[in-house]
Amino acid sequence: MEAALAVTRLPPNDPRTPALSVVDMHTGGEPLRIVHAGCPEVAGPTLLAKRRYMRQHLDYIRRRLVFEPRGHRDMYGAILVPSELPDAHLGVLFLHNEGYSSMCGHAVLALGRFALDFGLVPAPPKGAREAQVNIHCPCGLVTAFVECEGGRSCGPVRFHSVPAFVLASDLTVDVPGHGKVLVDIAYGGAFYAFVSAEKLGLDVCSAKTRDLVDAASALTGAVKAQFKINHPESEDLGFLYGSILTDGKDAYSEEATTNICVFADEQVDRSPTGSGVTARIALQYHKGLLQLNQTRAFKSSATGSVFTGCAVREAKCGDFKAVIVEVAGQAHYTGTANLTVEDGDPLRDGFLLK
């Protein structure tokens, strides 16, 4: 009897703030913490307005989810919200150690499974092998396709991106400690700077992670200081999210190409980076290195996990020629939790060590 009571007894929680019920997943090693209950209402008529409201009024929720002691500086989170788009099954706000992203491919791959398994989309017809999940991200509507059996997710997920394009190609950037380097900037729902790690004196496959992070951070800072990022359709999307260092193998090959993404406040993506794969496919297509429906494999130098990507059709974003990119990968569940706040805890909203 006492053992049963011990199991069901909950930790104390400040009654002024509800506990956050979360489901934890990972995609290619990159974590995702999904809040499915307990978050206060996120006000705003549009998803981008909700993102601004979250930043201005509810940022303590992000810190509790992502920061220590409940998380860590490389944790990633997702808040599910209603969408104003009639075709969307759900809206999502993406959270990281510095703030709020416009797109996250690894999260979309995980959310596809979550939405199907937790009943956020209509059950697929009997015998269906794939379910469609329309996810409204801050960058726009992204469609996920979830392998399923008996109405439950059972395998890899793929998604079709928003229009992806190249903002600048072979841009000369003076990177502190590395001199002048030719850099590409491409958009896959978020803007990234791309460069072969070799140009920064590193091997992306064997260098220490700390050295890769330092080089990528120097590149990000230099691009931000020397080049203005503008999105053709929305001011909210006009910012550089991070830098992706590659092995330089951009020409089409059946062999996987390796990269590492460093984004936000030196946060290291453990996966190949879904929005980064999207942008890198757009870049390769722009340079004539890839044709429509040619699939490439992208490997994370952090974990060795692999996503695939291909340009499925041409599109436009403002005046930019763009492509819709299909990205595929495997997400896994890792646990559930109730994140509580005890009254009087001086570290209730979290902290980060660097």
Swiss-Prot record:
Homodimer. InterPro entries: Pro_racemase_fam. The active site is at 104 (proton acceptor). In contrast to the T.cruzi proline racemase enzyme, lacks the conserved Cys at position 273 which is replaced by a Thr residue, transforming the racemase activity into dehydratase activity. Substrate binds at residues 105-106, 269, 274-275. Pfam families: Pro_racemase (PF05544). The gene is L3hypdh. It catalyses: trans-3-hydroxy-L-proline = 1-pyrroline-2-carboxylate + H2O. It comes from Mus musculus (Mouse). Belongs to the proline racemase family. Catalyzes the dehydration of trans-3-hydroxy-L-proline to delta-1-pyrroline-2-carboxylate (Pyr2C). One of its GO terms (molecular function) is trans-L-3-hydroxyproline dehydratase activity. SUPFAM superfamilies: Diaminopimelate epimerase-like. It is an enzyme of class 4 (lyase). Keywords: Lyase. Its EC number is 4.2.1.77. This is Trans-L-3-hydroxyproline dehydratase. The keyword Transmembrane helix does not apply.
